[in-house]
Structures are given as structure tokens and as C-alpha cells.
């Protein structure tokens, strides 16, 4: 039953972001899309942080049944379903804008559906997918295994586990809003923002596993949240929208999300296997660091090469 519930929860989570990004793309100007994506992602950060704190306090410290967290989650989901139904709806102006597009797509469906494989997996696109895989791999490994890592290998207990783990989520909110605003302001610098943030996040992730001092560990977690996935993801998505093939943008985003979701399956399972085999999750952290570092370097190199080619053509 719990596996079926997890499957249904995953389907819901996977379907939400595509719809949310579609709404923002329809209603938000190009110059503010990174910031809009950051706001959408901030909801995930708030939910993750509150979930970690409440579960540690109510279940681990107060001894309540774990099902209590499921009931709380179900209640909040129902509230948001009502809010979406009442507040977020298709207005007449939206439908007037959408209908001609739908008709045009029907008339030209054969052209719009086919994306050349060569363009879909061009080097700069492929390395963007790999970068996103590495970014999500590190994040989902942290989200899944950090509470257990803090408890079994760093001596944290009770509510301190959830509070410490939630620092990653809460620190990501100001990071996402701050860096997305900068990226929207300096739109031609998005690659530089992405590369610098990824390198810094990699360094913080490495520091997290290497330090034994609790204060330094918490600082590293806060900085990883501030600089990591939720901060850089809006900028990557904005960059992708500018560089993806204009024909079949939906297919491109689908491939991009596939790489990210694939990491959410591999990272928890692989780290768990490493923990069972070695008795420690440290190697799982190092693997995340290496994958993220490789993805960032590949993305940086292909964009440097692309920039050089564009300059020579001019």
C-alpha cells in the first residue's frame, strides 16, 4: 500500500511542475520568467522544510504515529485543490489567446511534433541535460538521506534532525529569489550564473560530508541550500527556453525533465545500496559531488566553445 501511495504521490508531483511552468510562461513576461520560476520552486522549499520539522517533532520526539503526517499532508492538498479551482482558472482572454494556437497546431501538427534528433541532443543541449541530472542527483540525495545521515553519522537527535535538514530548504528560498532576479537583470550572463552557482554548491556539498564540527556542518548546509538546486534551477530553465529548438519545445522540456526525474530514482536507491554495503553514506555524498562537478565542467566547456564559434562567425 505504501508503495502504491508513493507512486501516486510521485505522479502528482511530476504533473504539477509542467502545469505550473506552463501557467507562468503564459502570463509572465520573458524578462521576469526566472523570478517567476523561483517563486514556484519556493513553495516546494517551504513544504519540504515544514515537513522535515513537523515529522521530526511530532513523530520522532512526541511519539505520534507516522500516519499523522499523511493526514496533515492530505488536508493541505485538499485545501490547495479548492484554491486552484477557485482562483486559478481560464479567463475568456486566455481562451481567446489559446484557441488560435490550438487551431494552428492542428493544421501544422506534423511539423510541430517532430524535433530533429540532432538538435534535441546537440552538445549544448545534451550537457544541459547532464548538468540538470547532476544538480537533481545531489538535491534528491540530500533530501532523502540527510536526516538519516545526521542521525546515524553525526549524532543529531530528535527535533534537531528535522530542523537541521530543513535549513537546506529554507535557505534556498532567498537564494532562488535573489539569483533569479540577478539573472533576469543580466540576461546575457546566465551561463556564468549557472556555472558559478554549481561550483559553489559542489564545494558546500563536499564541505558537508568532510567537516565533523556541528556548526560548520550547519553553515555548509545553509550555503548549499542558498546556492544549490532551487537557486540555480530557475536560471537553467530560463536558459533552456532561450536555447532549445523552437520547433518542439515541449519535447525538449520533456527530455530535460526526464533527466531530472531519473536522478530522483537513482540517487536515493544508489545511496541506500552504498549505505547497506559500507555502513556509511559518505561515499554517496562523494558520488553526488563528482557527478555535479562533471556536469558543470561539461556545460561550461560546451558554452565556451559555442561562444567562440559565434564570435568567429561574426
What residues fall within each predicted segment?
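Cytoplasmic helix-loop-helix junction between adjacent transmembrane helices
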Residues: 5-46
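Glycine-rich segments within core transmembrane alpha-helices of 12-TM secondary carriers
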Residues: 35-53, 257-267
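Helix-to-loop junctions at the C-terminal end of transmembrane segments
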Residues: 177-188, 276
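C-terminal transmembrane helical hairpin of 12-TM major facilitator-type secondary transporters
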Residues: 189-239
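Extracytoplasmic gate region of multi-pass secondary transporters
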Residues: 123-176, 237
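Helix-loop-helix hairpin linking two adjacent transmembrane segments in secondary transporters
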Residues: 40-91
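Juxtamembrane intracellular "pre-TM" segments in multi-pass secondary transporters
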Residues: 94-127
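A late C-terminal transmembrane helix in Major Facilitator Superfamily
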Residues: 241-280
